[in-house]
Amino acid sequence: MTKLPYALLDKGSLLVASPDINGGIFSRSVVLVCEHSPNGSFGLILNKILEIDSPEEIFPLDHFDESKVRFCMGGPLQANQIMLLHTSPDSANSSIEICPSVFLGGDFSFAGEKEGRTRDDKMLLCFGYSGWQGGQLEKEFLERLWFLAPSSQEIIFTDAPERMWSDVLQHLGGRFASLSTIPENLLLN
């Protein structure tokens, strides 16, 4: 995996928090950029997992392998809004492809539909989202608060989201690989 130059920031890129962001929801976060334009940016944090039970009446997930469904904190904005990231191309007419084989959106009813669904489909239910005003993310890059990395279905739906931050930095190599070993609590160093 190679680091993407800042100029390549676009839908489908990963924002990887610099160790300089310490504390708060963005500390050691990996954000999937879902939209980026001069007017602003919108993304979903992928590695802040929420341990909650899903009420069957709200989330009809009976046709999904439970190990393939995760709940996460998508960001600090509108935490009562749920964003759906998934790998089901069958719902592509009501979804937007963010990167190859990863879709955003769709009606929750598609999750309960058995037809066309495979038990290999993966889903992230993200509570809230992350947003930046026009120029804000660019300013944060200049302050070296974020690194840019390419995304893939494998990274987004990893079986080890708690290691996503260090794994992505490790794959970027070079100085990024050494940053991946910095302990969360520097007093433990």
Curated annotation (Swiss-Prot):
Family to which the UniProt record says this protein belongs: Belongs to the UPF0301 (AlgH) family.
A cellular component annotation (GO) from this entry: cytosol
Signal peptide: none
InterPro entries: AlgH-like (IPR003774)
One of the Pfam families matching this protein, by short name: DUF179
Gene3D superfamilies: VC0467-like
NCBIfam families documented for this protein: PRK00228.2-3
Organism expressing this protein natively: Chlamydia trachomatis serovar D (strain ATCC VR-885 / DSM 19411 / UW-3/Cx)
PANTHER family to which the protein is assigned, alphabetical: UNCHARACTERIZED PROTEIN YQGE, UPF0301 PROTEIN YQGE
Protein name according to UniProt: UPF0301 protein CT_211
